From Swiss-Prot:
It is found in: Cytoplasm. This is Adenine phosphoribosyltransferase. CDD domains: PRTases_typeI. It is an enzyme of class 2 (transferase). Pathway: Purine metabolism; AMP biosynthesis via salvage pathway; AMP from adenine: step 1/1. PANTHER family: ADENINE PHOSPHORIBOSYLTRANSFERASE (PTHR32315:SF3). It comes from the Bacteria. It comes from Thermoanaerobacter sp. (strain X514).
Amino acid sequence: MTLEEIKMMIREIPDFPKKGIKFKDITPVLKDAQAFNYSIEMLAKALEGRKFDLIAAPEARGFLFGAPLAYRLGVGFVPVRKPGKLPAETLSYEYELEYGTDSLEIHKDAVLEGQRVVIVDDLLATGGTIYASAKLVEKLGGIVDSIIFLSELTFLDGRKKLDGYDIISLIKF
């Protein structure tokens, strides 16, 4: 298995979730045990030598890679969720969308002062969701060690929004 093979497995769905969008569907990677395992192993390899305490990931697809990666690396996992989905006291961060705003939440006790956190997601597009996730970690006193993606849509320039963070992406479209 290679990253090029993983890239070829990510199919493009036209006009989803709305007209004009070419959605990158990772479900073929997830359903193939060898491809999914290889993806997690390559994410783990990309983080070799780094010292961090936690992995945080936004819902929903970030969970699919963040939780198994945390398990593989022996660190804790912190979910970053849409409003009203976490049961304990939360901290919220509102961010801009193309049309309007959205927000994400994290438990107030999820990250301790000075803890180093890697943020994981399946795809870097515009960077808005990951930027909000990073700001939540920082508001709690955490340090964003790096942000890692399985894939990146380079033509959307999401890296610009994440300027100042150490960005890793394994597959580029």
